[in-house]
Regions:
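C-terminal functional regions that serve as terminal interaction/effector modules
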Residues: 21, 25, 183, 189, ...
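Short, well-ordered alpha-helical segments enriched in acidic and aromatic residues
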Residues: 39-60, 180-199
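Short, structured motif recognition centered on aromatic/hydrophobic residues
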Residues: 33, 95-98, 119-122, 130, ...
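Surface-exposed, charged secondary-structure patches
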Residues: 70-109, 210-250
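Short, low-complexity N-terminal intrinsically disordered segments enriched in polar/charged residues
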Residues: 18-43, 47-48, 131-133, 138-180, ...
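Intrinsic, low-complexity N-terminal interaction/targeting segments
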Residues: 61-63, 85, 200-209
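Short beta-strand edge/turn micro-motifs at domain boundaries
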Residues: 115-151, 251-273
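Bacterial Sec-dependent N-terminal signal peptides
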Residues: 1-25
Length: 273
């Protein structure tokens, strides 16, 4: 009898782990994150859902978000958001979510004081919990169009046999190409299925919108890589750091997707305009 209950307990544990290892559970984690912000506070939401090594951006610099929010006081206002797109690796333990956010001074009945789009990268930690590794957003003044949630499931890739490039190498190569070629560098590195989140603009989701945003970029931006991480199967990953232009200093985030012809930029988040 004891053996039977031990086996039953093991089955239940395995079932829970596999239930959490899915795009639906990652999306639910994002929704729970947003719900906690609304019901409790933004501070409590970030402390609860961020990985202890998770990154947020403060005054253009990437910092440890767990330490920042643990030590900070509650901030006034109400921050709301919801995912409209989610993508996950084939191992179902690493992915990202994105969608609109709004900030209200007192109540949700008021007009929002600010709005924009967020990007959050998630992973399953050793306890089988979804925690976010990095969170970054942009703001804009345009009206947000409600979009139905879209989930991108993993696609089987037929990589070239000699493909050995790491995500770090891809990021470094793009930055070097940008130094020498400027905006033309995007033609070799940007995925045909990509999102550009630039401050002051709605996310660019189609070729025409992406070209318009890239053309709007100022020349001479200097990137410094501070960190990067890829999924266990090296299918998704991200690189982040700072970007400088004259006296302006901001953070940046790129999410990379490994496609049939190598690493391609799936999402780029910039605050320069």
């Amino acid at each position: 009898m004891r053996k039977y209950f031990s086996l039953l307990a093991l089955v239940l544990i395995v079932s829970v782990v596999f239930a959490q290892r899915s795009i639906d559970s990652m999306v639910q984690a994002e929704k729970n994150f947003a719900s906690t912000s609304l019901v409790a506070s933004t501070k409590e939401a970030f402390v609860k859902f961020i990985d202890t090594a998770g990154i947020v951006f403060e005054k253009g610099n990437p910092v440890n978000g767990f330490e920042l929010y643990t030590k900070s006081d509650r901030r006034p206002g109400i921050l709301t958001w919801e995912p409209e797109y989610a993508e996950i690796s084939s191992s179902n333990d690493f992915g990202f979510t994105t969608g609109p956010w709004k900030y209200y001074a007192n109540t949700l009945k008021d007009d929002p004081l600010a709005k924009g789009h967020f990007i959050t990268v998630w992973h399953l930690n050793n306890n089988g919990e979804w925690k976010f590794l990095i969170d970054f957003g942009i703001n804009y003044n345009m009206e947000q169009k409600k979009m139905a949630l879209k989930k991108a499931k993993p696609e089987k890739k037929t990589l070239k046999k000699d493909f050995q490039q790491s995500l770090k190498e891809a990021e470094e190569k793009f930055i070097q190409s940008y130094k020498t070629q400027g905006k033309k560098a995007y033609s070799s590195f940007l995925s045909s299925n990509s999102r550009l989140n630039y401050a002051g603009y709605l996310p660019a989701l189609n070729p025409g919108a992406r070209k318009a945003l890239i053309d709007s970029l100022p020349a001479g931006m200097g990137y410094i890589i501070i960190g990067f991480k890829s999924s266990p199967q090296n299918e998704l990953g991200y690189a982040y750091g700072t970007v400088d232009l004259n006296d302006k200093h901001e953070g940046y985030l790129r999410i990379w997707r490994r496609e049939n012809d190598g690493w391609k930029i799936a999402v780029e988040v910039l605050h320069f305009k």
